[in-house]
Amino acid sequence: MIEEKKELKKRRVLQMARFYGAAAFTLITMRLISRAIKVRKYVPSIFQQNYKLPPFSQRNEAMSALTYASAASIGTFSTLIFGFCWALDISTAREFVFKTREFMSLPQALETDTSMDEETSKLTKQLQDLLSSENNK
């Protein structure tokens, strides 16, 4: 009983750490995005034209925007997922499947159909052979 409580506490602390880590990543990313937007803002001085754009590289701007957008979406969705898992006490993907099936009122299947077609089994065997030959070197 005491061991179960310790295990549950350790599990909840791990879930909390994941959530707060994802939230911190999201906040840092959003702060970087805000700073990047402020830097790019063009404020002309008294004798400069209002419509003159500062020189910039389109490739660098596109890469920067893609990086910031990707980091923001990854951070937001990871915070959402880890918060959901923390609230519902989910630690593994298998638990997530069971809770989702329970939520959608689907029958629980302990054994899933893991049969493969012929092409998939050949590909799996080739990959396993390749990985085992790399490990032997």
UniProtKB/Swiss-Prot annotation:
Sequence intervals crossing the membrane: 20-37, 66-88
Disulfide bonds: none
Keywords linked to the UniProt accession: Membrane, Transmembrane, Transmembrane helix
UniProt membrane topology term: Multi-pass membrane protein
Coiled-coil regions listed: none
Domain of life: Eukaryota
Keyword 4Fe-4S in annotation: no
Any GO CC annotation of this UniProt entry: peroxisome
Subcellular location(s) of the protein: Membrane
Disruption phenotype: Increases frequency of mitochondrial genome loss and leads to synthetic letality with a prohibitin complex subunit PHB1 deletant.
Location (main, coarse): membrane
Note: Present with 1835 molecules/cell in log phase SD medium.
Family from the record: Belongs to the AIM11 family.
UniProt-recorded name of the protein: Altered inheritance of mitochondria protein 11
